[in-house]
Amino acid sequence: MKNIFLHSLILENYRNFKNLELKIDNTPIILIGENGSGKTNILEAISLFYPGRGLRSAKLADICKTSEDHCSIKALLQSKLGLAEFTTQFKLSSNRRITEYNESKIANNELSKFTSMVWLTPQMEGIFTSGKVERRKFLDRIVYNFDPKHAELVGKYEYYMHERNKILAEEIQDDNWLKIIEEKMADISNHIAVNRLKTLEFMQQTINNLENEFPKADLSIDGIVEQKILDGEENIVSVITAELYKTRNKDKLIGRTSFGVHKSDFLVKHKKKNILAKLCSTGEQKAILIAIILAEMNYAIKLTKIAPVLLLDEVFVHLDDKRRDYLTEFFTYLNLQLWITTTNLESIENFASKAQLIKL
């Protein structure tokens, strides 16, 4: 098994840090400090070496230290392709983020070719009751760990959808170009939907077979494109293309694309109770979310033979002893680079004795 892990992390003008340099090993790392000391900021910085906007989904303008025009994050990282230096930097004046791999610029959605990450934060505990956009993004992040090209597909789909909306809004009379865009969207949609369904199938198998202290979940996706694939619809790309053509006038009026894989919802049920997770108690929702993360870790390692970096923000808060003990044993068994934030070591003293402690 190959581990993805950081050797070092350097922050400049990032959030509350003017300068911070950490040297770390391929071991569990515990960031300990009072609330507001910057523990979650460090996790967020690491998460920016994965497709997307990090574990907070923050606007780039918010991550620079107050009164500074730029910020940067550097990491020496054992990647899928070996030891490499990654840099991501942002300038307020240009409102651009630049990411580099060994001093060569790469697109944000290419990061999954090099890294693999999973995270769990308190903000995610409301994912079942929030809008479907957040749940869909959560599902796609899971897929990134199993198919590195999925992030690029999602990025391309969003680009072509934006182009289609622009052509419709500006009443550009170019049916041929619009047809080409819709055909590209349809082809990419098919790949995205298949990737999601395939991942959910294997995730469900993993959940069913994994015995732990957390409730089992039933996973599904509510989406027209995904359902057509499940129903065995033939010529799915042509069907999607035809639907996009049919909705042109409607989409022109409302100013957005009303049909497609960007409308799908990731649904999660409490298996034993047979109710949607959003109807469960907050404690049950957190437990179900942890169960999904555990299944993702198991499936990722089994399928790809790669252990991702795991970022856990205050994950032990409000867990009973049995579940806390299970998690510490599970993480020890996985032998991966795990980052945990906490305000104290109470109840995890044994686990802490095997970890690298960083006090903030």
UniProtKB/Swiss-Prot annotation:
GO terms for cellular component: cytoplasm. The keyword Cytoplasm applies. InterPro entries: DNA-binding_RecF (IPR001238), DNA-binding_RecF_CS (IPR018078), P-loop_NTPase (IPR027417), RecF/RecN/SMC_N (IPR003395), RecF_2 (IPR042174). Pfam families: SMC_N. Its main location: cytoplasm. Coiled coil: none annotated. ATP binds at G33, E34, N35, G36, S37, G38, K39, T40. It comes from the Bacteria. Keywords: ATP-binding, Cytoplasm, DNA damage, DNA repair, DNA replication, DNA-binding, Nucleotide-binding, SOS response. GO terms for biological process: DNA replication; DNA synthesis involved in DNA repair; double-strand break repair; SOS response. The keyword DNA-binding applies. It is found in: Cytoplasm. GO terms for molecular function: ATP binding; single-stranded DNA binding. HAMAP family: RecF. Belongs to the RecF family. The RecF protein is involved in DNA metabolism; it is required for DNA replication and normal SOS inducibility. RecF binds preferentially to single-stranded, linear DNA. It also seems to bind ATP. This is DNA replication and repair protein RecF. The gene is recF.
